[in-house]
């Protein structure tokens, strides 16, 4: 649904790419995550980091991203570095640069905090990371001004039990994979969804 104000401001974008205006409190603390050590990923990280700094917002990176071998900190003015497990608790918005795998990897650390995630696609498919790298700074400014559409994703909660004892529990975005480990052999398991046998 496009309005005339959006059309005037964004004439070069296709209608399906326009964000709808949803006014929300401003995002002030922006997390930035990336997983692959490819130069293309770090180029986008630097571009986004500089956009965040230009807007006088707080830039926060997780340790794993900060330690990417191709990331040059002389190209980034100000950044706070925290443990990955804390980034969802501290940030109002997290930007993930990479492919869908990077988004899924980040979701592991972010899911319990319900922090919004913006994916910049440096992978192949981009079902989850749908912002193109050459549009990243522009789209980020739109989001930070309140022009965006929030897409809620369902989360899976998974428990592994031995009898009544829970031996592992976790959250997942797309799927849960059960496997026997390093050696390939049959495994016996019972699966329930919402307490019902499947």
Label every model-predicted segment.
Residues 1-93, 134-149, 160-170:
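ATP/NTP phosphate-donor binding region
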Residues 37, 100-102, 125:
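Short glycine-rich anion-binding loops that position phosphate/pyrophosphate groups of nucleotides
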Residues 41-42, 101-107:
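Short glycine/serine/threonine-rich phosphate/pyrophosphate-binding segments
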Residues 46-51, 111-112, 193-194:
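Short, solvent-exposed amphipathic alpha-helical segments in soluble enzyme
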Residues 64-66, 100, 122-123:
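Short, ordered loop/turn segments at secondary-structure junctions
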Residues 109-127:
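Gly/Ser-rich helix-loop-strand patches that form or flank binding pockets
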Residues 124-198:
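Catalytic core of DAGKc-family lipid kinases
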